Each structure stands twice: as C-alpha cells, then as structure tokens.
Amino acid sequence: HGHHRRQRQMCIRDRSYPTKELVSLANSILSAVNDQNFVDIATQVSSALWRGDSVTLDEISSSYFATTSQVKEKLKTGNEIRNGKGYYFGSAYYYEKELYWGLDRLPYLEERLTELGARKKSENNEICALNLKAPKTLISEKKVNLYYYPSLNSPYTFVSTKRIREIRDEYPINLFMKPVLPMLMRKMNIPTNKAKYILSDAAREGRRYENEMKIIHSPIGNPARKSYSLFPAIDKAGKGFEYIEALLKASFQDGINIGDDNFLENLVTNLELDWE
C-alpha cells in the first residue's frame, strides 16, 4: 500500500510545474546564451527543467551563467519586445507581423517560410505537419456523446461550427449543446493584446477551414442574454445547434445585432418553430 502511495506521489510530482529554484537557474543560463547557440542550449535546458533534472542544469550553468540583475534586465527587455509585437505572454513565435502560439500554429509559419523559398532542403516533407485526418468511416455499435460548449462572443466558437456540423452529420454521435456565458460577461479581464490575438488567430483559422469572419457585431450584454433565454425551448425542440450556429453567423459574418426582436423572430420561424 505504501509503495503505491509513493508511486502516486511521484506521478503527481512528475506532472507538476518546475520549482522556482530550477526556473531561476534556467533563466540564468538562457540569459547568458548568445543567439547562435540559443536553440541548442534552450532545448537542453527546457528538457532538463521539465524533468526536474537539477544535475543537468547545474552542469550547463557552469558554462552559461547570468547574475540576478542581468536576468532581470534580460526579462524586462524581452517583455518589452513581446509587448511591442502585440502579444501578452511567452511561448509564442513572431515573424514579420504574424504571431504563432503553440505547436498547432507552427504549420502556418512553416507554410509561410516555404512559400518564401526559405526551405533549405528540397524534400516536400513537412516538419510541423499536424496529421489530423479523421477516419473516412467510424463504425460504432453505439453513438458517441459529444458535448459542445459554445460562447456567443467567441470567434473560435464561430469558426468551429462548420466542423461541428460536419462531425454531427458524418459520424455516429449524440450532440449535446452546453452554451456558456462569454468571458466578458463573467467579469473576466482580457488584456487588449490578448483580445487582438484571439481575433486575428481565429480569423486565420476561419480562412483555413473555409468559415471566415466578415462583419462583426459583438453580442455582449443584453443581446447574448436575450438569445440565450430562448435556447432551452429551442434545444428541447431539437434545433439547439442550428440556433446557436445561426446566432454566431449573424454576429461574426453578417454584423447583425442578435438581440433584435425581429431578427430573433425570423430566425425562430426559419427553424420551423412557433415564435409565439
């Protein structure tokens, strides 16, 4: 029993964030590395940091070490550069006025560099290919439950609707709609740079998946509340997805105020439901 408890504790520890001491050591190392060696050293440091490998970090720090004041100045400069590029936290790439956050955005950067003729090798193999290909057929004895949490003010939600519809139509699933209140209506503070990035990133995703944003009219406030108030009855009638999809199209493509009574009445009527 004690052995299993120790194993669980080790698993929890292995999955936790690195300690502040190791983060400080990693920052010290990377602050002392020149641009030419940065990628190689950063790869070693990152791997050791997330393994909690203090021995490896100590070894690297014998060759690369910056004082506390040097690290502070380096981070200050880096944050200023990041802010100037319109971003709000780390782990993002920036190239020629376009930001790429996370591994699933690197294919965009690779495509762009390839189009510019920057690829060093002639092979066509993609380095950052996502390889996200759904099976042509999905055989299942029972339907799979898909829970969808749309937000009426989310550009990402809008972009996702086309693929959610395709999944619903082409695979054996039960689609359960779980609308959520927009972040701004939950008193969450969204930095300006974050809001700008979300909009530009979602627009990029929309172009990629052929569901582009065009004229935007934010539904924040009363329009969202009024629209959501009708949802339970419409969802009960089996038209919940179509209703949310139409609201998002109105907000992110057609520039329509979805709180307008005439719009809502027409929408409900078009869904072949009784407005009264």
Please describe what each predicted stretch is.
Residues 17-18, 64, 147-153, 217-221, ...:
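Conserved strand-turn element in the central/C-terminal portion of the radical SAM core barrel
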Residues 2-8, 12:
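Single conserved hydrophobic/aromatic residue that forms the stacking wall/gate
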